[in-house]
Design a protein with these regions (language model features):
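Single conserved hydrophobic/aromatic residue that forms the stacking wall/gate
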Residues: 1-12
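Short glycine/serine- and small hydrophobic-enriched flexible loop segments
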Residues: 3, 21-24, 65, 134-141
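Acyl-CoA/ACP chain-elongation machinery
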Residues: 6, 40-54, 87-94, 111-161
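Channel- or pocket-lining gating/hinge segments that regulate access to a cavity or pore
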Residues: 10-34
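Short beta-strand-to-turn element immediately C-terminal to the catalytic PLP-Schiff-base lysine
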Residues: 18-22, 93, 190-194
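Conserved small-residue
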Residues: 19, 37, 80, 85-86, ...
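Phosphate/pyrophosphate-binding loops at sites that engage ATP/ADP/AMP, CoA/4′-phosphopantetheine
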Residues: 25-30, 63-82, 104-108
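Flexible, low-complexity linker/loop segments at domain and module junctions
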Residues: 73-77, 110, 159-195
């Protein structure tokens, strides 16, 4: 067994897969539904090849688009319970994302639990968004909000609740996951508890 011979056997016991299917199909086959996609948003601000816009402009556009679609299902910005931040722990990204969250959620931004699971996984590049969406589904299912580990000395300009150091329990019905990329590419997806 090539995988076990290289010591990777345990890696394959801890994986996630997202299956996206229509509600009627999932219900007909008796699938366990971990969450329902409320909406998504994408933007490309093309501000800089590697740096995000300092005001979070492009990120805010993607988040607003996702929220706009969620509002069609009766979900308001004040109902967002958890955000899985892009959170790469770089000064420009974290400050820009903080500003974007504040622009989009207003005062509610201070009530939302936020964490960066990249603090535990590292940056998974093209796989990051899928894993972080799966994390959001598990947060909805379990009510366990993962921590942002190693957040000992947060930047004073990043003053939201980034769930430092320890996981917390909370009732979570609506989540948002942010993914930003080089060249100003921004994406946001929102999930909610299936009822």
């Amino acid at each position: 067994d090539l995988v076990r011979s290289r010591g990777l056997g345990d890696v394959y016991k801890r994986q996630a897969i997202l299956i996206l299917e229509e509600r009627q199909h999932a219900l007909a086959r008796g699938a366990k539904i971990y969450g329902e996609i409320l909406g998504y948003g994408t933007s490309a601000d093309a501000y800089h090849m590697a740096a995000p816009h300092e005001t979070g402009r492009g990120a805010a556009v993607a988040m607003r688009m996702a929220l706009g679609k969620a509002q069609a299902y009766g979900v308001s910005p004040a109902q967002v319970d958890y955000i899985n931040a892009h959170g790469t722990a770089t000064r420009l990204n974290d400050k820009g994302e903080t500003l974007a969250i504040k622009q989009v959620l207003g005062e509610h931004a201070y009530n939302v639990r936020i964490s960066s699971t990249k603090s535990m996984t590292g940056h998974l590049l093209g796989a990051a968004g899928a894993l972080e969406a799966a994390v959001c589904a598990k947060v909805i299912e379990t009510g366990v909000i993962p921590p942002t580990i190693n957040l000992d000395h947060p930047d004073p300009e990043c003053d939201l609740n980034y769930t430092p150091l320890r996981a917390v329990q909370a009732d979570v019905a609506v989540t948002m996951s942010n993914s930003f990329g080089f060249g100003g590419h921004n994406a946001c997806i929102m999930l909610r508890r299936f009822a």
